[in-house]
A protein has these predicted regions:
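Short amphipathic alpha-helical face segments that pack within enzyme cores
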Residues: 125-136, 270-274, 445-452
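Active-site metal-coordination/substrate-binding segment of hydrolases
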Residues: 83-152, 158, 171, 428-442
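Acidic, glycine-rich active-site loops and adjacent beta-strand->loop/helix elements
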Residues: 92-94, 148-159, 179-184, 213, ...
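Substrate-recognition/cap regions that form aromatic- and gly/pro-loop-enriched pockets
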Residues: 326, 331-402
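Acidic-glycine-rich active-site phosphate/pyrophosphate-binding loop
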Residues: 95-110, 192-193, 198-199, 242-252, ...
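Midchain, well-structured core segments that form catalytic/ion-binding scaffolds
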Residues: 157, 164-341
């Protein structure tokens, strides 16, 4: 590594650290959960406000900015190539808050070297880190071969329609990386499968059932209101019972986490469904439906639905049920699966429908196939070599179950800044969970990695 450059970057980061943290706090302060579309805000007022704040921060750094019709925006640096450009892409929308927070999710806190708040890790902290990488390049006066855009998306957590809009109306970058996953470099993503398991109109024992705040997150709380006498019910682990009106409120208490990494989570919906079935708290229509839903919750590897499989690049399939709710007398259970190359959306649909039987209907199926980029391609090598030189590691590219913006671009990967092996503090939680946490030192290290990686990408013939 160029030692002079290394020293310049270290001095720059030290000089800008406090302002960088203030900028993350300013962005975290914007509640950017997807809302109702309105004029000038296709994904609601919150994501639009977060986009405005991002572009305001970038402009304050002296970067050129552009709002792409309120779907997406970017901060940019000019380059000599009139056609090709490099890009980073983060997102400034966030998942719903959920339960279990010990403080206001939109007021960033600092504790023992960690940032706490919704979006500090996913993906507002990384968004600000990329802006500071571009700020360094601008202040140092680099004459770039390729222009660079730091894209800011506003619809990543739900449908990624923002990047679809961008790619329909703007040219795609020659190469793009998204700081929305783990280091070192993710060169492949599992396929994405989503659907709803829907009941017939029940009119039975279950008055209400609800749980979860996002389709792509394992819920830590769920409940059902049923017509029964509490004296007839048995206690069960992670279940509480409360009289409510003429019935009983049954609450399940689990452990939340991301759909792509469900290991170690406990799905509260599954706890409630099992309790209802084990205690006969359902009529025949409800029982048949809940038995089908139980197959979903039986295993995060998909064994209950008969969709389990694994391959070399990606490992095993995962599946979770993120939300359950009632609407017009029907029960809806969402499902989110991340699948390897040994299956596909059509095959999974057939297998799941066969497993569900006649008591439940599979609706609103969506599927996106896996993607994979060879690890020895020049851009991948530029990223992985930079990471290893900065950290002193000998890490290799990896694949994952998370779905990022990378799959939407012709040539893209995800590139940090999470560290999967770094244990969370007792007071901190994961992405999509309560008390979302990000380590300050690793975020600052990511700024250095992104600066050097962008300079190396500038040297590649795309």
């Amino acid at each position: 590594m160029d030692q002079a450059l290394n020293q310049k970057i270290d001095a720059y980061i030290a000089q800008n650290k406090e302002q960088l943290l203030k900028d993350i706090a300013a962005l975290v302060a914007v509640n950017s959960v997807e809302g109702t579309p309105e004029e000038g805000a296709p994904y609601g007022a919150g994501p639009r406000a977060a986009l405005d704040k991002t572009l305001e921060l970038a402009a304050g750094m002296g970067l050129a900015t552009r709002n792409c019709e309120n779907y997406i925006g970017y901060a940019g640096l000019a380059g000599k190539d009139p056609e090709k450009y490099l890009a980073t892409i983060c997102h400034v929308d966030v998942v719903p808050v959920g339960n279990g927070w010990t403080a206001d999710p939109f007021t960033m806190r600092i504790q023992d070297g960690w940032l706490l708040g919704r979006g500090v890790a996913d993906d507002k902290g990384p968004m600000v880190a990329t802006l500071y990488a571009l700020k360094f390049l601008k202040e140092q006066g680099y004459e770039l071969r390729y222009p660079i855009r730091a894209l800011a998306g506003t619809n990543e957590e739900t449908h990624m329609q923002d990047v679809d809009y961008y790619l329909k109306n703007y040219p795609a970058p020659a190469f793009c990386f998204t700081p929305d996953a783990e280091f070192p470099v993710c060169n492949g993503e599992k396929g994405l499968f989503g659907a709803k398991i829907v009941s017939p109109v029940c009119n039975g024992v279950i008055v209400e059932i609800e749980g979860g705040v996002a389709n792509n997150a394992v819920p830590d709380r769920a409940s059902a209101l049923v017509k029964t006498d509490i004296s007839k019910l048995k206690n069960a682990p992670n279940i509480t019972l409360e009289p409510e009106g003429d019935g009983v409120r049954i609450r399940g208490w689990g452990k939340s986490g991301h759909a792509a990494m469900p290991q170690g989570t406990v799905n509260a919906i599954g706890l409630v469904v099992n309790y209802l079935l084990d205690n006969g708290l359902c009529n025949e229509t409800e029982r048949t439906y809940l038995e089908a839903v139980r197959k979903l919750h039986a295993s995060t590897a998909g064994e209950g639905l008969g969709i389990n499989c694994a391959d070399g690049p990606f490992g095993p399939l995962t599946v979770i049920g993120g939300r359950i709710y009632m609407e017009d007398g029907r029960i809806f259970q969402t499902m989110d699966s991340r699948f390897p190359t040994c299956t596909n959306g059509k095959k999974m649909t057939e297998q799941i429908r066969a497993a569900l039987g006649d008591g439940a209907e599979l609706r609103d199926v969506t599927a996106a196939e896996p993607f994979y980029i060879e690890a020895d391609s020049p851009a991948i090598l530029a990223c992985i070599n930079t990471y290893n030189e900065v950290t002193g590691e000998n890490a290799k590219p990896f694949t994952m179950g998370g779905g990022t913006y990378a799959r939407h671009f012709p040539y893209a990967v995800s590139f940090g800044p999470e560290h999967v092996d770094l244990p969370l503090p007792e007071f901190g939680g994961p992405m999509h969970g309560a008390n979302e946490a990000a380590p300050i030192d690793k975020l600052l290290e990511a700024v250095k990695i992104y600066i050097i990686a962008l300079l190396r990408l500038e040297e590649i013939d795309f």
